[in-house]
Amino acid sequence: MAGPTRTKKSRTKPLKRPESRTSELAGATALVTGGSRGLGRAIAEALAKEGCRVIIAGRDEQALDVVSATISRAGGSAYVRHCDVRNEKSVDALASAIHKQFGRLDILVNNAGIAHVTATVDQLSTEAWREVLDTNLTGMFLVTRAMLPMMHSGATIINNLSISAKTVFPGMAAYNASKHGALGLTDTLREELRPRGIRVISLVPGATDTEIWQQFWPDAPREKMMSPASIATVVIAALKMPGSATVSELEITPTGGSL
């Protein structure tokens, strides 16, 4: 269960202003859940480079502090917030803190996610099933619902679904189900929020050199995988599209083909 929550700016003093202060995204307020490592970290750093005020949220506060310090050294603005997306009170506290400090949210990146050691359905524990679904699907729902009152026309939601939203990996029933469910939630949000001028984008990356891939496929050829930074570059490009247009889905695969 989540511990005490707090909002803070990195203790590291910025050394310089971001080079991209003229970016279309400069001054936007962005929240990245699961921002302490992997793809979440890469997206948070890319947003900060564009001049966004980035809130990075997650359970590993020490790791979040490292990301915040890295962003600050590069001249960006990062704010750390402890949050367990499975816990409704923790999510509501996060929303309250963002509203109090910034008053609005322009970009929401739902990136928090976990996976468990592979197990066939007949060997999968109820506890493991619930933990994955609660994090990857219910967590996305709780965060989005809590943040929507602060999001207005021109805002964007990006949900990281992973390639498991489009295919299945045997032995990963909970993860597959959570991502397929997240795809359905994302598609629903897109239609519900279209009249409000809020864009909703599905992020569907293939093999990316992140902790989850390293954990479950340690022998996979890393040289054929995409880097988190390359995915973040595509995300930034989508965010910079004119408000009158949107990319509904970003399905990104390695140039070298399947592993």
Protein language model regions, located:
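Residue(s) in the substrate-gating loop at a strand-loop-helix junction
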Residues: 162
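Conserved glycine-rich cofactor-binding loop
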Residues: 29, 36-37
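Conserved glycine-rich Rossmann-like NAD(P)H-binding loop of the short-chain dehydrogenase/reductase
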Residues: 50-67
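Active-site helix of classical SDR
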Residues: 144, 178
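Substrate-binding pocket helix/loop in short-chain dehydrogenase/reductase
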Residues: 119-121, 125-130
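C-terminal helical subdomain
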Residues: 202-203, 218-259
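The beta1-alpha1 cofactor-binding region of Rossmann-like NAD(H)/NADP(H)-dependent oxidoreductases
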Residues: 61-62, 82-94, 126
